[in-house]
Amino acid sequence: MVAARARLDIATSNLANVSTDGFRKLTARGALTPNGARVGAERSNRRGEIRRTGREYDLAIVGPGHFSVRDAAGRVVDTRSGSFERTLRGTLADARGRTLLGDAGPLIVPQDATIDERGRVLAGDNDTHRAIPLPRDSTLRAGFLEESPVDPIAEMVGIVDASRSFETAQKVVGAIDSLRQKNASDIARVR
């Protein structure tokens, strides 16, 4: 039942994030231990398609890597979602207000600057030496976002399958309880 419940939770999470840019699908992984079944989630490395948005501060990483953003409490979080807006202070922030970090703290983007495929901020003909850190084999596409690679049909099938497994496990547990009660009453009658 634990495994079926975990598969159900993971499939519903994947389905809920089918439209979340940069989301990476979760997969259930389990193991039998002396103390019972252990189930966890593993994040997929499969990337989604790159979609043109035309918005200059939408950024997609092609290849491995992530964006680092800092929230108001100072926590740094890694994300693949590259939907950013330029703030009045010249930083880039996501919809939650988290600030995009460059290689030297918050990334400052001058008004008419662009961001190139290596993540460098270019103002006019000058490289401002501010950059979004990227692995060597990755590039950045400004005006694009990475879509979620989740297949909604496959996740719905997974939800139905996990629900059926859960229901079957519940019936088995109910049958075992009934047998225990019957055996206990049979033993009591014999005495």
Regions found by a protein language model. Name each.
Residues 1-191:
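Amphipathic alpha-helical polymerization modules
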